[in-house]
Structures are given as structure tokens and as C-alpha cells.
Regions:
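Catalytic alpha/beta core domains of metabolic enzymes, predominantly
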Residues: 94, 110-112, 123-178
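Active-site beta->alpha loop and helix N-cap motifs at the rims of alpha/beta catalytic domains
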Residues: 15-19, 25, 38-39, 43-95
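Active-site-adjacent beta->alpha loops and helix N-cap segments on the catalytic face
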Residues: 40-49, 69-71, 90-105, 119-124, ...
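Glycine-enriched alpha-helix->loop->beta-strand junction motifs that scaffold or abut catalytic
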Residues: 27-30, 82-84, 102-111, 127-133
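Conserved, mostly hydrophobic/aromatic
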Residues: 34, 88, 125
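Short beta-strand/loop segments at the ligand-binding rim of alpha/beta enzyme cores
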Residues: 2-9, 83-87, 104-112, 161-170
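Glycine-rich beta-to-alpha transition loops that act as phosphate-gripper elements at the mouths
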Residues: 12-15, 64-69, 90-94, 113-119, ...
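Single conserved hydrophobic/aromatic residue that forms the stacking wall/gate
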Residues: 177-186
Length: 186
């Protein structure tokens, strides 16, 4: 009998106090960050990553930018510095997919491909070796496109095509009925 994998919840923030509170509940499994969130924190990115890792999380999406070579170089550097927690986050662009393939297949580094807006992008990302694909559910819903429908469609294609190494990580989830209320925090 095949048992489904347990759902994981990632917190999208660079606020280490909030991360610490939610981690203490046992409800979150990882953290995703991006340059904007890091900038809002007013801290050095690597200082934030180190603190998140020290909290105990072993899956932190650390976004890299630039052309494919720059993303590869930065991704390898981050994965070397944070070997127990780094998942390199790249955009679903031609350069991002080239970086994903290099990082994931040649360097065995976990990669989260973000900015997924359709099934074809998810398939290309999985083919490039992505650990996670991050469809922008909230942004699609904001534009009257069924974001959760996209998750279902990607999942169906991944099941039919036996894609087992790539997981779906819903991104940009902004509806209050799908987010954890801060009143749950002790």
C-alpha cells in the first residue's frame, strides 16, 4: 500500500522572531525568503539565514539573482556555507532553469524554482531537477485565475508522468483562510 507523503508547511518571511514562534509550534517545516523580505528585515542575508538555521530549520529557500552563471556561483557558495539547510531558490526563467539543472544535477543541491504560473513551467522545472516548484497561487487568484486549480493540474501531471523527485510548494498564498492566524502563537 502506498501512503501519501505528509504535507509540509513553509513560512515565507525573513522575520526570525516570527519564525522562532511558529517553529516552536511544530507546524512549520521550512522557510522561504526573497531579496525583498531580507531587505525589509534590514539585516545581512547570511546573518538571517544563519539565525534561521540556528532556530532548527533544515530547509531554507535562499533566493539567488543574476544570469545563470551568477546564480550557479551564488547557489554553490550558499550551499557550501549552509550545507544542512540551503535550498537555492531560482526564478522560472531560461537562466533560472539552466542554473537549476547545473545546481541540482551536477552539484546535488536542492533547488526551489519559483515564479511558476502554468503546468508547462512546472514540467520544465521538474525536468531541470527542481526539488520544489513554487506556483504563485495567490497572484493567480488575484488575477481571477484558479491558483489552487493550477496546483491540482500540476499534481495530476506529476502523478501521470511519475515525477517523484519534485514537490509542489504553493507560493504567494495570501488568503486568510489558508494562512495560520498569529493568535495561535503562544
Amino acid at each position: 500500500m502506498h501512503l501519501p507523503e505528509v504535507m509540509k508547511i513553509f513560512l515565507d518571511t525573513a522575520d526570525t522572531d516570527l519564525i522562532r514562534k511558529y517553529y516552536g509550534t511544530g507546524l512549520i517545516d521550512g522557510v522561504t525568503t526573497n531579496p525583498t523580505l531580507i531587505m525589509k528585515s534590514g539585516r545581512d542575508p547570511e546573518e538571517v539565514y544563519q539565525e534561521i538555521q540556528d532556530i532548527g530549520l533544515s530547509d531554507i529557500s535562499m533566493e539567488v539573482v543574476g544570469n545563470s552563471n551568477e546564480m550557479i556561483e551564488e547557489g554553490i557558495r550558499l550551499a557550501t556555507k549552509f550545507p544542512n539547510s540551503c535550498t537555492v531558490k531560482v526564478p522560472c526563467t531560461p537562466d533560472g532553469l539552466l542554473a537549476c539543472a547545473e545546481l541540482a544535477t551536477k552539484n546535488l543541491i536542492r533547488v526551489n524554482v519559483t515564479l511558476i504560473f502554468d503546468v508547462a513551467q512546472a514540467i520544465l522545472s521538474a525536468k531541470a531537477g527542481a526539488t520544489y516548484v513554487s506556483p504563485f497561487v495567490g497572484r493567480l487568484d488575484d488575477n481571477s485565475i484558479a491558483g489552487l486549480g493550477l496546483i491540482k493540474d500540476i499534481d495530476e501531471v506529476f502523478r501521470v508522468q511519475a515525477v517523484h523527485k519534485t514537490r509542489i510548494l504553493s507560493a504567494s498564498v495570501s488568503y486568510t483562510h489558508l494562512t495560520l492566524p498569529t493568535t495561535w502563537l503562544v
